Amino acid sequence: MASTTFSGPVTSTNGFIGALTGNIAGTGSITHTATAINATATATAAQVATGYITSTSAAATAITLPTGTLLGAALGATQGTVFDLYIDNTAGASTVTIAVAVNGILSTAAADTAGSFGDLTIASGATGIGRFTLMFSSATAYVFTRTA
């Protein structure tokens, strides 16, 4: 296979069109630009689109995700789009709980196994990082589950 170099914006002709939030290093790791939510709030689509939300709150915090319509538009989502969201509460002093909004649906795993993959609460301290996966069933609706 020939080596190819690209510069500037690149759009695929085979179906994937979207913005990359973060930097992809040569090792395949992704570095996100974190956004902070330190009080109970509804996250904006732009905040979620960064892929990495931090909380350093001393009080319990609830973060409600944006609607499927707003988030789908921000991500350029279509049916089959999969997006990972990390919540980092390692510097927080209390829990962070995630909630979904209109057109956000908890997966069966999230609804049935709340003690593991369905756990929508992120502890504070050293173990306080959660990874959540959003799988879009259309441009305006997503299924949400904890995956780590």
What is the meaning of each model-derived region?
Residues 6-9, 127, 146:
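Intrinsically disordered, low-complexity linear regions
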Residues 3, 40, 52, 119-121:
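Short, well-ordered helical secondary-structure segments
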Residues 3, 78-80, 124-127:
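Short solvent-exposed loop/turn micro-motifs enriched in small/polar/acidic residues
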Residues 50-52, 123-136:
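Extracellular disulfide-bonded cysteine-rich modules/repeats
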Residues 15, 19-112, 136-148:
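Exposed extracellular interaction/assembly regions and N-terminal maturation sites
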Residues 1-11, 17, 21:
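C-terminal trimerization/auto-chaperone modules of long, extracellular attachment fibers and adhesins
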Residues 72-74, 117-122:
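Beta-strand-rich interaction surfaces with strong enrichment in secreted/lumenal proteins
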Residues 86, 122-123:
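Short Gly/Pro-enriched turn/cap motifs at secondary-structure boundaries
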